Swiss-Prot record:
This is tRNA1(Val) (adenine(37)-N6)-methyltransferase. Keywords: Cytoplasm, Methyltransferase, S-adenosyl-L-methionine, Transferase, tRNA processing. GO terms for cellular component: cytoplasm. It is an enzyme of class 2 (transferase). GO terms for molecular function: nucleic acid binding; tRNA (adenine-N6)-methyltransferase activity.
Length: 235
């Protein structure tokens, strides 16, 4: 069974098109679950982000949705094997048709991001990476499940993130936090983490760099991830 060993849990990903990656680890580390009683993870994949948020909270109940069948079963197995399995519910569902009367205090997603991708020979990987619905559609769906003071956090490529930021006002949502993620010191950002809320607040801007000039994890990256990684070497 191939996968990734964290300090307190193991994520198997041999049946998933999208493997454990830095995007998921960043969102699971940075999204703010403070005071969240109910958390929703859209397109959970391996279940990584849901499990990370379970570790970071004392009692939050987490619902994780996944459409692709193989990934759904693997996310279920990963969640059942982790120390917080009594607080994670993995469901096979399409976010565009899923119905829920429950409202969530925090909604997170590392959504598909190739809006105009070329099809590969791996249909499972295509489903995981290619956007069937726009990121605006994902945000609109998320809004209906959000509590009045809740937050929605997405990680996206920079261009897609900027586009969604411009569109969010159409839903009456405010971007209250914006993280630029740089792979290495001196390089332009490759990813952004955006947090939206129906409540206005001045947008907080942050930058996080993963590697320093010596290819070691930066102190900032280490601070966010050290509770998860077995070994994190900072400067």
């Amino acid at each position: 069974m191939s996968g990734f060993q964290f300090k307190q849990f193991f994520i198997a990903h041999d049946c998933c098109a999208m493997k454990v990656n830095t995007d998921g680890i960043l969102l699971g580390s940075i999204a703010d679950p403070s005071n969240a009683r109910h958390i929703l993870d859209l397109g959970t994949g391996t279940g990584l982000i849901a499990i990370m948020l379970a570790q970071r909270t004392a009692s939050a109940q987490i619902t994780a949705l996944e459409l692709e069948e193989n990934a759904f079963h693997q996310a279920q197995e990963n969640a059942q094997r982790c120390p917080w399995n009594n607080r994670i519910d993995v469901l096979q569902a399409d976010i565009m048709t899923w119905k829920s009367t429950k409202k969530f205090d925090l909604i997170v997603s590392n959504p598909p991001y190739f809006e105009h991708s070329l099809a590969s020979r791996n249909k499972q990987r295509d489903l995981a990476r290619a956007v069937t619905y726009s990121h605006f559609d994902w945000l609109k769906q998320s809004q209906q499940w959000l509590t009045p003071n809740g937050r929605i956090s997405f990680i996206l490529p920079c261009d897609a993130g900027k586009k969604l930021l411009e569109q969010s006002h159409l839903l009456g949502l405010y971007c209250i936090e914006y993280w630029e993620i740089c792979t290495k010191v001196g390089l332009s950002p490759k990813r952004v983490i955006l947090t939206f809320s129906p409540q206005y607040a001045e947008m907080a801007l942050h930058t996080l760099t993963i590697y320093d000039e010596n290819q070691r994890y930066t102190a900032d990256f280490t601070q966010f991830t050290e509770i998860f990684y077995l070994k994190v070497n900072s400067k």
